[in-house]
Swiss-Prot record:
Chain spans, region Disordered: 57-92
Top-level taxon in the UniProt lineage: Archaea
Origin species: Halobacterium salinarum (strain ATCC 700922 / JCM 11081 / NRC-1) (Halobacterium halobium)
Keyword tags: Cytoplasm, Gas vesicle, Plasmid
Keyword Heme appears in the UniProt entry: no
Entry GO CC: cytoplasm; gas vesicle
Subcellular location: Gas vesicle; Cytoplasm
UniProt similarity note: Belongs to the gas vesicle GvpH family.
Protein induction: In PHH4 (a deletion of the p-vac locus) transcribed in all growth phases, maximal expression in mid-stationary phase. An unstable 6kb transcript able to cover gvpD-gvpE-gvpF-gvpG-gvpH-gvpI-gvpJ-gvpK-gvpL-gvpM is detected, as well as smaller transcripts. Gas vesicles appear earlier when grown in static culture, possibly due to O(2)-limitation.
Cysteine disulfide links: none
Organism phylogeny: Archaea, Methanobacteriati, Methanobacteriota, Stenosarchaea group, Halobacteria
Record's protein name: Gas vesicle protein H2
Cytoplasm among keywords: yes
Further information: Encoded in a 14-gene locus called c-vac which produces cylindrical gas vesicles only in the stationary growth phase.
Known partners and oligomeric status: GvpF to GvpM interact with each other in vitro, and may form multi-subunit complex(es). Interacts with GvpC. Might interact with GvpA.
Length: 163
């Protein structure tokens, strides 16, 4: 892959074309895909992220009968990325999940089981199961926008016997 060192940058048109062909050949060796993972720490906030870049020349591996964003693709638990964080304005827990392949027509559901596990389902497939600290938590909102699920989970109210 090209480096950011100015002395390594091609200067002429032929050098630039040569470097481009080399880069495309490297991508071709990797089936046109690059994957990575990284973490950013900002004070008390930690962000883990994954990325995948795919470059091709128009030849799609999908068959013509399988449209992009098929709900079957969304059930792959390996591609679902989940992040949890405390809400800034309440005691709620916010769960954000990247669900590739989910469309507006795809059934997405979440439930808190009696065991305290939060399950996220796409269609009939459970794509993620998270253990919650409080088994009495309640899901107060569920939205899916652009293949991103956002859940707000509220802790159970303390009963009169807990005080």
């Amino acid at each position: 892959m090209p480096t950011d060192d100015p002395s390594d940058r091609p200067s002429g048109l032929l050098d630039q074309l040569s470097r481009l062909i080399e880069t495309l050949a490297e991508l071709d060796d990797d089936n046109g895909e690059q994957h990575g993972h990284s973490t950013i720490d900002r004070g008390r906030t930690r962000i883990d992220y994954d990325y995948a870049v795919s470059i091709g020349l128009g030849s799609d591996a999908r068959s013509p009968s399988t449209p992009a964003g098929n709900a079957d693709d969304a059930g792959d638990a390996e591609t679902a990325h989940i992040e949890t964080r405390a809400s800034d304005d309440s005691d709620d827990l916010v769960v954000v999940a990247d669900l590739p392949g989910v469309t507006d027509e795809t059934a997405v559901d979440a439930a808190v089981e009696d065991t305290g596990a939060l399950t996220i389902s796409v269609g009939d497939d459970v794509v993620e199961r998270l253990t919650l600290d409080d088994p009495g938590m309640t899901i107060t909102s569920l939205t899916v926008t652009n293949q991103i699920l956002e859940l707000r989970v509220t802790p159970s109210e303390p009963s009169a016997t807990d005080t």
